[in-house]
C-alpha cells in the first residue's frame, strides 16, 4: 500500500536558523527533512512525494488501465507522469499508450511520455497538446497549484483559477466517459466550479490522500465519466 511508511520515519531533524533563509523557507526545509513520503519517494525512485497522492487516487477509483491517452498539466518534476507511465505500462515503443506532459519547467524523460515545455496559459498551448494527442484523451490530470503566499484565501482563489482552466481544457479534449483529476484548496469559493463539473461528469468526488499533509487544505477533485 502507498501509505505504508514503515522504515521511512527518521529521527526529527531540526533546521538551524540562518540570516539568508526566510521563516517560510526554513519551515519548508524542516517539513521536507522530516517528511516520510519524501524519504520514501527517494527510495522508490519517484521525483516527488506527490506521486503517492496519484497512486492513492488510483487505488481508490481504479482509473488507469493500459492503452490510454493521458494529459498531465503542470507536470514538473514528473512524479505524476511517472505514476501514470507505470500504471498504463507505457513505453517509448508502445504507440497505444500516450502521455502528454506539459510544464514551463523542463523535466527529465519518462518512458512513454511526450513532454511539451510551454506555459499552459499561452495562447497556442492548447492546440499543441491537441495535436500531440492525435485524438481524444482518456484522462486529464492536474496537480497545478499557484505559488503560495501563506494567505489562505488568496492561495485558495489562485489555485482554484488554475483548476478552472484545467477543467475548461479537459472538456475540449476528453472523450465521452473520460476522467478529470485536479487539485483544489478548500476555502468556500470552489462550490461554483463544483456545480459546473457535476453538470459535465456523471460522478464527482472529493478525495484527500493520506499522503497529503494533514495541515494542508488541499483536496483532489475526481470527476468520472464525462457525459
From Swiss-Prot:
GO cellular component terms attached to this protein's record = cytoplasm
Keywords in UniProt for this one? Cytoplasm, Methyltransferase, rRNA processing, S-adenosyl-L-methionine, Transferase
Q: Which Pfam families has this protein been placed in?
A: FtsJ (PF01728)
Query: Which ranges form a coiled coil?
Result: none
Q: Does the keyword Ubl conjugation apply?
A: no
Record's subcellular location: Cytoplasm
In this chain, S-adenosyl-L-methionine is annotated as bound at 78, 80, 103, 119, 143
Cross-referenced InterPro entries: RNA_methyltr_RlmE, RNA_MeTrfase_FtsJ_dom, rRNA-MeTfrase_E, SAM-dependent_MTases_sf
Family to which this protein belongs? Belongs to the class I-like SAM-binding methyltransferase superfamily. RNA methyltransferase RlmE family.
Name it: Ribosomal RNA large subunit methyltransferase E
Amino acid at each position: 500500500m502507498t501509505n505504508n511508511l514503515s522504515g521511512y520515519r527518521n529521527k526529527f531533524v531540526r533546521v538551524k536558523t540562518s540570516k539568508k533563509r526566510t521563516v517560510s523557507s526554513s519551515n519548508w526545509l524542516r517539513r521536507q527533512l522530516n517528511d516520510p513520503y519524501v524519504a520514501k519517494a527517494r527510495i522508490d525512485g519517484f521525483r516527488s512525494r506527490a506521486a503517492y497522492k496519484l497512486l492513492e487516487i488510483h487505488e481508490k477509483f481504479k482509473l488507469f488501465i493500459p492503452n490510454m491517452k493521458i494529459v498531465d498539466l503542470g507536470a514538473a518534476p514528473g512524479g505524476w507522469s511517472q505514476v501514470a507511465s507505470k500504471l498504463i505500462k507505457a513505453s517509448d515503443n508502445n504507440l497505444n499508450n500516450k502521455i502528454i506532459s506539459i510544464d514551463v519547467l523542463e523535466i527529465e524523460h519518462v518512458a512513454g511520455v511526450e513532454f511539451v515545455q510551454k506555459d499552459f496559459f499561452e495562447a497556442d498551448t492548447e492546440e499543441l497538446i491537441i495535436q500531440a494527442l492525435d485524438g481524444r484523451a482518456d484522462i486529464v490530470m492536474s496537480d497545478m497549484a499557484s505559488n503560495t503566499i501563506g494567505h489562505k484565501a488568496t492561495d485558495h482563489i489562485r489555485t482554484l483559477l488554475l483548476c478552472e482552466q484545467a477543467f475548461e481544457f479537459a472538456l475540449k479534449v476528453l472523450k465521452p466517459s473520460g476522467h478529470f483529476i485536479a487539485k483544489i484548496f478548500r476555502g468556500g469559493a470552489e462550490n461554483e466550479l463544483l456545480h459546473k463539473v457535476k453538470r459535465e461528469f456523471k460522478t464527482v468526488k472529493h478525495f484527500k490522500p493520506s499522503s497529503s499533509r494533514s495541515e494542508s487544505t488541499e483536496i483532489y477533485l475526481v470527476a468520472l465519466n464525462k457525459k
